[in-house]
Amino acid sequence: MSSCRYNGGVMRPLSNLSSSRRNLHEMDSEAQPLQPPASVVGGGGGASSPSAAAAASSSAPEIVVSKPEHNNSNNLALYGTGGGGSTGGGGGGGGGGGGSGHGSSSGTKSSKKKNQNIGYKLGHRRALFEKRKRLSDYALIFGMFGIVVMVIETELSWGAYDKASLYSLALKCLISLSTIILLGLIIVYHAREIQLFMVDNGADDWRIAMTYERIFFICLEILVCAIHPIPGNYTFTWTARLAFSYAPSTTTADVDIILSIPMFLRLYLIARVMLLHSKLFTDASSRSIGALNKINFNTRFVMKTLMTICPGTVLLVFSISLWIIAAWTVRACERYHDQQDVTSNFLGAMWLISITFLSIGYGDMVPNTYCGKGVCLLTGIMGAGCTALVVAVVARKLELTKAEKHVHNFMMDTQLTKRVKNAAANVLRETWLIYKNTKLVKKIDHAKVRKHQRKFLQAIHQLRSVKMEQRKLNDQANTLVDLAKTQNIMYDMISDLNERSEDFEKRIVTLETKLETLIGSIHALPGLISQTIRQQQRDFIETQMENYDKHVTYNAERSRSSSRRRRSSSTAPPTSSESS
């Protein structure tokens, strides 16, 4: 749906129409410029009323290209052309014109509300998509900024200054400020999602989109992102049991350690940004194809696509990120109870995480606190999953492609064919040698005969084994891919046969039509022949009659001319020769 407004006799489209449609509207408007109708003055010299003039000026002509639901074609509806109706005479006519203009303007407003602009909806939806993408980017930036500042504050407060210093307070205030901005961005992000839901589903009330599931996830996301170290110095008593000596260890720890580690849960924003920036999600063609195939474009689908395209890169980035984050978390958990500086050292923590990730577990380093043990447990689970994924990726990389399989099968088939021929030739050769040494010699050498018989049996077993290998190779070659290819070939052949049969049926129908026409012509032929013969007979008789008339006329003229000559000869005077 798009609308054009009247501006000086030229319609200028307000929405992004195609160039051809825009040019068509402009040519139509230039050929027939729209002008507001003027009120016609009555016979008595009365002018239009001021209300009619105001209505005529306020209700300027407006063309709305609408697309109603019951019709797919674009219709041009002209509104506001009756604003200044012509007066029948005097002020009464002017008043009538003003009333018609007011009704037309109200009809225009109601029609605008009824026929809402689809182009405007699509543009609004696209703008909401872009705003949601930018909000997600900003949320990730502020979330990562808070994590980085938290790590800096934790490291500096452990080695450079204490929690009661002004620097720690300033950094915590900065973390709190970034967290407040992050929460605001998340709330606005979900507001944009609700607006998108309303645009997509045509809902009028935003409370329709607020399901219990959506409310739960919004509250959970706000709770996860709201956790951060609070400005101030707050401590608690932490009791743990040492690993090897099993002696209890009690120390005073900061509350910040409990509030700092959950901040790494903000990294889920990376998956959201990857989804919103993915070409599969932003491309209209891919989304249309996915909608036709009933595919939901979510983070899981994007991760599967990345694992298919670049599995090594994804696993490498994930493993290194998990390694560094888990090592720092173990260091932060263990530094209050690690008296020998083993696991509280960053390099030592990385070694502990690496042997736990790879499921080796030498036992030279173990965590002392339940926090460190929980991190090591999660690391072991992630390591088992990553190891399985690495094995699957390596196996897929080592697997032959379809073309390589075809080449390998062809080469193996050629070699097995040669081996079958060689084994068959060996069987024939040993058969001939056995016959030669038993039938064609005077004295039979039994040792030589047994040797050839032994070789004969070996050749037979070799021939059987080679044929068995050839059967196995043929069975391996007939994979599901080849069967699917054969099925596609058969489908193409059947489709071709159906097209040919349809063409043949059309030709038969055409031939039947021509035969019917020919039969009708043959049935009409005797009548045409008789009609032609009668016409020719009439023409012949008329010709004969004309010839007869001509002959009679000619004979009559001839007889008259001869009689004239005889009369002239009888009445003429005699000549001198006749008188003598």
Curated annotation (Swiss-Prot):
Intramembrane region residues: 346-366
Effect of R396E: Mostly eliminates inward rectifier potassium channel activity. Loss of inward rectifier potassium channel activity. Significantly increases outward single-channel conductance at positive potentials
Predominant location category: membrane
GO cellular component terms given for this protein: cell surface; dendritic spine; glutamatergic synapse; membrane; neuronal cell body; plasma membrane; postsynaptic membrane; sarcolemma
Reactions catalysed, as given in the entry: K(+)(in) = K(+)(out)
Phosphotyrosine: modified positions: Y161
Compositional bias ranges of the Basic and acidic residues kind: 551-560
Transmembrane segments: 140-160, 169-189, 215-235, 257-277, 306-326, 375-395
Disordered: annotated span: 1-68, 88-116, 551-580
Gene behind this protein: Kcnn2
Keywords, comma-separated and alphabetical: Calmodulin-binding, Cytoplasm, Ion channel, Ion transport, Membrane, Phosphoprotein, Transmembrane, Transmembrane helix, Transport
Membrane-protein topology: Multi-pass membrane protein
Protein name (record): Small conductance calcium-activated potassium channel protein 2
Region ranges (Calmodulin-binding): 413-489
Subcellular location: Membrane; Cytoplasm, Myofibril, Sarcomere, Z line
Purpose of the protein: Small conductance calcium-activated potassium channel that mediates the voltage-independent transmembrane transfer of potassium across the cell membrane through a constitutive interaction with calmodulin which binds the intracellular calcium allowing its opening. The current is characterized by a voltage-independent activation, an intracellular calcium concentration increase-dependent activation and a single-channel conductance of about 3 picosiemens.
Ranges of Low complexity composition bias in the record: 48-61, 569-580
Tissue specificity of this protein: Brain.
Family to which this protein belongs: Belongs to the potassium channel KCNN family. KCa2.2/KCNN2 subfamily.
GO molecular function annotation: alpha-actinin binding; calcium-activated potassium channel activity; calmodulin binding; inward rectifier potassium channel activity; protein domain specific binding; protein homodimerization activity; small conductance calcium-activated potassium channel activity
Residue stretches of biased makeup (Gly residues): 88-104
UniProt effect for mutating E399R: Increases inward rectifier potassium channel activity. Does not affect inward rectifier potassium channel activity. Decreases inward rectifier potassium channel activity. Highly increases apparent calcium affinity
Domain of life: Eukaryota
Record entry for activity regulation: Inhibited by bee venom neurotoxin apamin. Inhibited by UCL 1684 and tetraethylammonium (TEA).
PANTHER family recorded: SMALL CONDUCTANCE CALCIUM-ACTIVATED POTASSIUM CHANNEL
Written domain comment of the UniProt record: The calmodulin-binding domain (CaMBD) forms an elongated dimer with a calmodulin molecule bound at each end; each calmodulin wraps around three alpha-helices, two from one CaMBD subunit and one from the other. The coiled-coil domaim mediates heteromeic assembly.
Effect of H337N: Loss of inhibition by apamin and the organic molecule blockers UCL 1684 and d-tubocurarine. No effect on inhibition by tetraethylammonium (TEA)
